[in-house]
C-alpha cells in the first residue's frame, strides 16, 4: 500500500492538486493507495467517484495538522506501507521520524515554499522537516539549486 499525505487534492482546483491526483492514480497500477487530504466543499462527491481510498481531515487549521499527523501515525503503525509521499514540507513536519523509518518517504519541494533566508526559524523548520524524508524531489532545476543553496 502507498500513502499520499497532502494539503492539496481535488476537488480543490490547482496545479498541485492535479499533480497529487495524478501521482495517486499512477500508483494504483502498483498497489492500493490511501490518500490523507484536507476536506473541501464537494469532496464527498469526488471521493465517491474515485478509485482511491481518501480520508479527509477537517477542523480548525491549528488543530487539523496535529490530528492529521496522529491519524497518519496510527495508520502507518497498523499497515504495511511501501512508500509515503508528501506534497510539502509542512505535510511531513509533524510526522514522527520513528514512524517514517518504517517505509520509504518522498517529499516534494517548491521554490516559493523553501525560499527563507539561512538561519531563520522558517529555514530551520524546513530543513528539519525535509531531513525526515528519504528522498526530496524538487519540482524544477531552479528549486533544486535553491534548496542546495539554502541548506
Place the predicted regions along the sequence by residue:
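Short, well-structured alpha-helical segments in soluble
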Residues: 70-79
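Structural motif
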Residues: 82-83, 135
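A short, active-site helix/loop in glycosyltransferases that binds the activated sugar's phosphate group
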Residues: 133-151
